Amino acid sequence: MADPIQVEVIRGGVVEAVHRVHAVAVREGQIVAEAGDPRILVFLRSAAKPIQVLPLVRARPDLDDREIAIACSSHLARPEQLDIVRALLARAHASEADLETGPAPSRIEHTCSGKHAGFLLACRVRGYEARGYSLASHPLQAELLETVAAAAEVDPASITTAIDGCGVPTFALPLDRCAHAFSRLPGLEGGARVIAAIRAYPELLRGPIAADAIFVREVDGWAAKGGAEGLFCACSPDGLGVALKVDDGAFRAIRPALAAFLETLGVATGTLGFATIENSHGERVGELKTRPQSHVPKGESRR
């Protein structure tokens, strides 16, 4: 096993903190690069959204790219984002009151309301009762579990589930299975539409300076989605899947770790790895950098 990627938080030339990051790259079911534990068990959290939206995309090919992107989003409740959520609700003949996201600060302003609006539309398309769609016992959630399992090529019974922050089930998989699921996304039915939507509107996933958006802008042809507690999954157009997990859940370590890991695979990352620390005046007071030699491709791993 290669060492985890170590990301240093540097202020005034002093290393103030260090984040350990597990990373794995998978192609055609085989691990091609790793750092740390490639099989650490992780919850997909919001990184599952590009997979969870597949049943809806397959059933409603008339959805536009903005609607698909918002259904994959962990948005910031910007006006343009909420307008698209409302459009999805209208398609579902539903209202904000039907969202089961919880009032934070209102149901439609919840960061996962796009996904939930997509779930309501999926219920309408499938003929499911909308009420209770967030419950693990609901037929929609059973279908989504099957969808995630099929993407990762695992037995659904092997997937541990828990309740996500927005109230719906979330799925635990080994990190390499997360990467495998994303590696297969371009070839799955509806997957190309999801990737095209993410690439067309990366700022809808969260915001214009979020890691997802910066990644899509800087890494040609790739799509990605981050999840809570420091998880990040991405795929190339030719079927390379990558998944990273920060041990302590600090998402700020993702960009430098991801850039360093991808560069070992020969992937150009532009300014992705340039992560700074700013004070309350917006002044740069530090930076995040990976420690040299803390990440190596599998073929060169120190064992």
Where in the sequence are the language-model features?
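Structured C-terminal helix/loop/strand segments within mature extracytoplasmic catalytic/sensor domains
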Residues: P186-R303
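Glycine/charged-rich beta-loop-alpha catalytic/anionic-binding loops adjacent to active sites
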Residues: G29-R39, R66, A157-I163
